[in-house]
Amino acid sequence: MNITVLAVGTKMPRWVDEAVAEYAKRFGRDVAYALKEIKPEKRGAGVNAAQGMAAEEKRILEAIPQGAFLVVLDERGKAPTSVELAEHLKSWRQNGEHVCFVIGGADGMTDRLKQQARMMMRLSSLTLPHGMVRVFLTEQLYRAVSILHNHPYHRE
């Protein structure tokens, strides 16, 4: 199964990169996992949030793998349980889907990008730092895979 995470933002703290790498290597051969950073648009004089999100949208759309099942992370999305996420992964794998998760920038993402998604998912009702979202999402994806393999990592 192929999973791509597109995350707006670069230059994360070392602990973020290390944590994501740790969970990514745990997937093993069953999952081809890739995290791709999308350059954020600089904010400041003459660039408002809407313009910034539009520029980031263009970069995101260019980075989405051809034919991927698009899942955007958004505070208005559905928050699945770990078991429900595992069921989604199982279905996507059975359908041969390449799944692409998108983590928006500091101002979020455009409505147009959200409308193109086949699923909107919320990780938490809390506001989380972008680096933490990368770690949290990757860990939950690993947890979902471990559930599908009856691995003892996840306990009910």
From Swiss-Prot:
The gene is rlmH. The keyword Cytoplasm applies. Disulfide bonds: none annotated. This is Ribosomal RNA large subunit methyltransferase H. Homodimer. CDD domains: RlmH-like (cd18081). It comes from Neisseria meningitidis serogroup B (strain ATCC BAA-335 / MC58). Belongs to the RNA methyltransferase RlmH family. Keywords: Cytoplasm, Methyltransferase, rRNA processing, S-adenosyl-L-methionine, Transferase. It catalyses: pseudouridine(1915) in 23S rRNA + S-adenosyl-L-methionine = N(3)-methylpseudouridine(1915) in 23S rRNA + S-adenosyl-L-homocysteine + H(+). The keyword Methyltransferase applies. PANTHER family: METHYLTRANSFERASE, RIBOSOMAL RNA LARGE SUBUNIT METHYLTRANSFERASE H. Specifically methylates the pseudouridine at position 1915 (m3Psi1915) in 23S rRNA.
